[in-house]
Amino acid sequence: MSRAQLTSTVEQNTGGAVAPVIAGKNALANGAFEIWQRGTSFNTASAYTADRWQQYSNSAQSVSRQATSDSTNLPNIQYCARVQRNNGSSSTAALAFDQNLETVNSIPFAGKTITYSFYARAGANYSATSNVLNAQIVGGTGTDQNLITGYTGQVNIISSTLTLTTTWQRFSFTATVGTNYTQLAARTYYIPTGTASASDYYEITGVQLEAGSVATPFSRAAGTLQGELAACCRYFYFDSSNAGGGLCRQASTTQSYANYRIPTVMRVAPTITISNPTGAYIFSGGGGTSITGISGNGSSQAYYGLSLTHGSVGAAGYAADLSFGTATIQLNSEL
């Protein structure tokens, strides 16, 4: 055994030194819950929350970003996701939290041994019977499907229960993936009981899915924070007012068009959602006016277009300056 292998083994078993950064080892993007482009708190039955992670239940639940606040049992990971039943809720529907891998990232695991690991702890009023949390790796034989709507040939490759305490613990599970599986998903869920109190939740972080029979120290999927953001932007990109606007081309005094390059090539041509379009402005020919409407005008994996209507300004053929102001653009290529 080399010194590097020995050091890694000791660190893994003792929880000691910081793990080496190994880009590509972890198949799950944003496993440390550092990227939250959509916001940091959600209260709904089904939605994407932290980048790449979605919640699902038959009733509204809360998912939020929290500080891990424990440098002893959980060193070197700043954030976690809190999955919570709403205070006062009497719904006992399962609360699920999962990430779908696209087919191109699932096929490399076919026929291999995998290990699924994460850190988790319970809230003070966690209501699952015997403090149980369920952990699953789900497989399917389809292409780029979503676990909420179901996988073709769906099967649980890993399906285990674990017991939470209010202290962070690391859990790991190992199994072999069938040679015919073309999609994987990681899921945790709990089944609440009774009526929820204020701290009926569990928290999770350091989520990792890797090839091999041993849970190695946690690493970001892309190695660095910048790389992790780029990995997340393959599926969702949030263009905010802080990004400015740039130039657009006027078709008339009241109609303009803009085209933008997306910083990361997306999984597929994204759908475009615009919020608060009237918060944007256009400046042309020495004057300026408010935008009255913005709509998507085509997209590809690398570019997207906008069609803008506005008050009279400039002239056809002018290059105008566009400021998003408080308007935001969301590009979605999720599964």
Residue ranges and their predicted role:
Residues 2-335:
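Extracellular and organelle-lumenal recognition/adhesion modules and their flexible linkers in secreted
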